[in-house]
Design a protein with these regions (language model features):
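Gram-negative outer-membrane beta-barrel transporters
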Residues: 417, 485-489, 605-607, 626-721, ...
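Membrane-embedded beta-barrel scaffold of Gram-negative outer-membrane proteins
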Residues: 339-368, 538, 544-550, 577-636, ...
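N-terminal Sec signal peptide and the immediately downstream disordered periplasmic leader
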Residues: 1-92, 213, 286, 290, ...
């Protein structure tokens, strides 16, 4: 505690010092700089480039918003060949990410803002019970679908709870992907293509994209974007079972032998993304704007993208890009969004209606052999079946109908306001069917007296089906009093009611009386109000001090845990529901710009109550979520960017985060300790640093040559908050820090661009999470000679070339 208190005092002092130095430096630059700004960039009267956002529902200069917000331009994403959320957020202050493979895309969020995370880093194979701590919007549709980053205007990253700005609340922050709108002015388009090769891959990666803007009249236009991206894979599956036509492992010396037949599969984690988006924009009158859009994406993945760090059953270590699982783990996902946005300008305010419907569904095959082999299931329940291949066939679905109305006043009055109403009906579905293929046939041969019994038994080991429905109704708003030309106070409130229901059907066990299905249904409503307060002071025309106190909220839910019968848990009633978790975010900061310098410095402290944790029940390991006590996250965020002379640009982002439990974590209904107070929250590095430096040269013929280097560093992270080992699955681990370096060199003419790029220049094997060998590794004693231990790693070095042609 002494250390934490010392940090807060020292951090605050340092932050104020940095802010004052930045402000003074910016003032000096404004007086001495004579560099010419590009003519196509909007500037204020004193030469400051304007970056506009719509975070508050109106178009405004990001420097005039009294909150902590970062903007990533779509052009920068294109120029640096960034197409994934993970790569983008590595360069955003306050954010940390887990390097989930493509199988987890759309199933679990990989982003944490300001340290608010207790979900184990390795989660990602199954739809979690809890919702993410960071809300995600595609334009004005709240959804987490992890779309590819193509044809994007900008990304707005807001830190801290945002429930009084948007209908969908959040705990840690909000990420908004703002797509490019159709343009009335002219017909134009572009085509992009890239080819690259990743270390340890036997093939090449490639992508092709096209964008068309088609104006039909001065107030009607259409925009189409489409493309595909193929990654050839780089993880080799070293010892996959050879299967017969029924999916049963082949026994080369007869069904009763302990021998197995395996093969290797190189570059098994290939992936393919196909996407398209169509939007139509109309302005029937000067006051009315309508935009209808449809977006879809399809993902297919050959297998998992994480290697095994450890040994096989013969004691031989796996290579750095080898996985020891006995079964391939393919997956697929389809996602769709249909949205209608309408804006009407009344003069004094703009009324916006955002109606949307999204749907996504996915499937995957998972290998559970390591889990069964290391937790006694094969010995106790399956007579040590010699070719263990427990396979999980999983599905997930998420669909919602959302309507949001927002009335936003024009700025410049004594009082400014944002008023909103929000409705969402969300349906979630998940299933898990586990098979041990070949077990009943082997058991019938091993125990001939019971052959009829085993032949009738089949190979299905476990069935789990879950249907959830969630209703969210909210009224929200902000009121700003501009009591001085340079000072203002804002207050906000979000009042809401949630209704949540969960129906689950489970049929565990191969053998009677354990294979009797039992349904469970639990409902849970909640209603409350959240508040926000903000003060901001314009220290100079382009410099602002701000401080905010805001409350965040994440809905609770219910667990399907049997209360009675063979599979009842001890203290099962304590597992039936988990409460909402809430937080109080306090921050102060200074942001501004002068000439070519931009800066944003902030310190924050977050008190997190009733923290939610995805876990398993202690006896039978049912999927569940639980509440803990309290946690605290505090830290410092720093962003600097600008130009040095006419040709150099730079950016520097730094985050310090100290996120820990402030109360011990116990198993619900018991006094079993899972984590002591003071435990570091998982996937949250203390230090995050990123930066970039670029140089532009202009040739006599007008061509531009741009060279850029970017780097990121994160310090060590923990794998799970459960460090004591009372959990069914022990995954406690700590992973060292690592650095990533990227290079690019581009030559561009009037309507074309060619880029040579290198990602992960030093081929750093950075690990951000794992399924540990202690729980998933090899176990020759039960004839499991592979390993399901896996590490979530950064993508190996990738070298490629991309081209773009505009027409």
């Amino acid at each position: 505690m002494r250390k934490m208190m010392s940090f807060k005092k020292n951090t605050l002092t340092s932050a104020i010092g940095v802010a004052l130095i930045s402000a003074y430096a910016g003032h000096a630059c404004a007086q001495s700089s004579t560099a010419t700004q590009p003519e196509n960039q909007a500037k204020t009267d004193d030469g400051v480039q304007v970056v506009t956002v719509t975070a508050q529902g109106r178009t405004e200069n990001v420097l005039k918003i009294p909150y902590n917000i970062s903007v990533v331009k779509g052009k920068d994403l294109d120029d640096n060949n960034i197409t994934s959320q993970t790569d983008m957020l590595r360069e955003v202050a306050g954010a940390s990410v887990v390097s989930h493979d493509a199988r987890a895309s759309g199933v679990v969020s990989d982003v944490t803002i300001r340290g608010l995370n207790v979900t184990p880093a390795a989660e990602g194979d199954f739809q979690l019970s809890t919702t993410p701590t960071v809300s995600v919007y595609v334009d004005n549709t709240p959804t987490f679908a992890n779309f590819i980053l193509k044809d994007i205007n900008r990304v707005e990253v807001l830190r801290g709870p945002q429930g009084t700005l948007y209908g969908s609340g959040s705990l840690g922050g909000t990420v908004r992907y703002i797509m490019n709108d159709p343009d009335f002015d002219s017909f134009y388009g572009k085509v992009d293509s890239s080819v690259s090769k990743t270390y340890n891959s036997g093939g090449t990666n490639n992508s092709e994209d096209i964008v068309l803007n088609i104006p039909f009249s001065k107030n009607l236009a259409m925009r189409l974007s489409a493309g595909k991206e193929y990654d050839s894979g780089y993880i080799d599956y070293a010892n996959v079972y050879v299967l017969d036509g029924k999916g049963t492992p082949v026994a080369p010396s007869g069904i009763l032998s302990t021998q197995e037949l395996t093969r290797s599969v190189p570059a098994a984690n290939w992936s393919k993304i196909v996407y398209d988006r169509l939007s139509v924009l109309a302005e029937p009158t000067p006051e009315l704007k309508l935009e209808l859009s449809y977006q879809r994406q399809s993902n297919n993945v050959g297998s998992g993208g994480s290697p095994t760090i450890g040994l096989n059953g013969a004691g031989v270590p796996y290579g750095p890009y080898q996985f020891g699982g006995a079964t391939l783990e393919p997956a697929g996902r389809d996602a769709y969004i249909t949205a209608l946005e309408a804006d009407y300008d009344f003069g004094f305010a703009t009324l916006s209606s955002n109606s949307s419907k999204y749907h996504q569904e996915g499937w995957s095959i998972g290998d559970n052999a390591g889990l069964y082999a290391n937790h006694g299931f094969l010995q106790a329940d399956y007579y040590s079946y010699p070719r263990p291949n427990p396979i999980a066939y999983r599905t997930s679905g998420d669909s919602a109908l959302t309507e949001e109305l927002r009335l936003v006043s024009k700025k410049g009055n004594t009082f400014d306001y944002v008023l909103g109403a929000y409705y969402q009906k969300q349906n979630l579905q998940a299933s898990d069917f586990d098979n041990i293929n070949g077990f009943s046939q082997w058991a019938a041969a091993e125990f001939p007296a019971a052959a009829a019994y085993f032949n009738a038994l089949g190979n299905n080991d476990f069935q789990y089906q879950r249907w959830q429905t969630f209703y969210d109704r909210a009224l929200y708003g902000n009121l700003t009093w501009n009591f001085e030309p340079t000072m203002r106070i804002t207050g906000g409130v979000r009042s809401f009611r949630d209704d949540f229901s969960n129906t689950t059907l489970m049929a565990p066990g191969l053998q009677p009386p354990y294979n009797i299905p039992f349904p469970l249904q639990v409902d849970q409503p909640d209603s409350r109000s959240l508040f926000m307060g903000n003060f901001s002071w314009d220290l100079a025309p382009n410099q602002m001090f701000y401080t905010t106190i805001s409350q965040g909220y994440r809905r609770g839910g219910t667990n399907a845990v049997p209360l009675t019968g063979n599979f009842a848990e001890v203290d099962a009633a304590a597992w039936q529901a988990y409460k909402p978790d809430t937080d109080v975010n306090t921050e102060l900061g200074i942001k501004g710009a002068s000439g070519d310098l931009r800066y944003n410095v902030s310190v924050f402290d977050i008190k997190w109550h009733d923290i939610q944790l995805d876990t398993q029940t202690p006896i039978w390991g049912w999927f569940a979520a639980q509440n803990g006590g309290t946690a605290d996250s505090h830290g410092l965020e720093l962003e600097l960017s600008g130009k040095a002379g006419r040709d150099w640009r730079y950016a520097l982002n730094y985050t310090y985060t100290d996120a820990r439990l402030t109360q011990a974590l116990y198993t619900p209904g018991t006094n079993l300790l899972e984590a002591p107070s003071g435990t570091q929250l998982p996937s949250v590095p203390h230090n995050n640093l990123s930066g970039s430096l670029s140089h532009v040269s202009t040739f006599d013929n007008g061509w531009n040559w741009t060279n850029r280097i970017s780097a990121s560093y994160q310090s060590s992270v923990t794998n799970t908050v459960m460090t004591v080992g009372s959990d069914v699955i022990t995954n406690a681990a700590t992973f060292g820090g690592f650095s990533l370096f990227n290079l690019s060199s581009s030559v561009s003419g009037e309507n074309w661009n060619m880029t040579l790029f290198v990602k992960n220049l030093s081929n750093q094997l950075g690990t951000t999470g794992a399924l540990t060998n202690a729980s998933y590794g090899t176990n020759p004693a039960v004839n499991f000679n592979g390993s399901d231990g896996k590490a979530m790693i950064t993508q190996p070095r990738t070298i490629g070339i991309s081209g773009r042609y505009n027409f």
